[in-house]
């Protein structure tokens, strides 16, 4: 199963992420976002940021997850390549760690700045193979 792919969207970037579990799909969604920003294969999981989020549904939880990661990019220039998380669908909570390092122009390719997560075309679908998450980020 592929982890994520991009799809065409006027002036923004569409991402479709896959996972056998919801956690894997959320992780791959985040990886897709950071692949827009830089080549994540060159991002070493040196530091981590702990993340605790509450949402009112899965879509809101995904929105907050991506926004939280973008906050760390905007405020600390952190880029991430590895994610360990747990999602409790009963309480609609996410907790985990995002692993990466500070962006370094000598090591990391500067691609496109992701301004924000959006609710545009946001969907989380359970399939026979796991989960498919579709969303658009503002660039």
Swiss-Prot record:
Superkingdom of the source species: Archaea
Pfam families (alphabetical): Archease
InterPro entries: Archease, Archease_arc, Archease_dom, Archease_dom_sf
GO BP terms in the entry: tRNA splicing, via endonucleolytic cleavage and ligation
Binding residue positions for Ca(2+): 12, 138-139
Record SUPFAM superfamilies: MTH1598-like
Keywords: Calcium, Metal-binding, tRNA processing
GO molecular function: calcium ion binding
Family affiliation: Belongs to the archease family.
Biological role: Activates the tRNA-splicing ligase complex by facilitating the enzymatic turnover of catalytic subunit RtcB. Acts by promoting the guanylylation of RtcB, a key intermediate step in tRNA ligation. Can also alter the NTP specificity of RtcB such that ATP, dGTP or ITP is used efficiently.
PANTHER family listed in its UniProt record: ARCHEASE, PROTEIN ARCHEASE
The protein's name in its UniProt record: Protein archease
Species for this entry: Saccharolobus islandicus (strain M.14.25 / Kamchatka #1) (Sulfolobus islandicus)
Source species taxonomy: Archaea, Thermoproteota, Thermoprotei, Sulfolobales, Sulfolobaceae
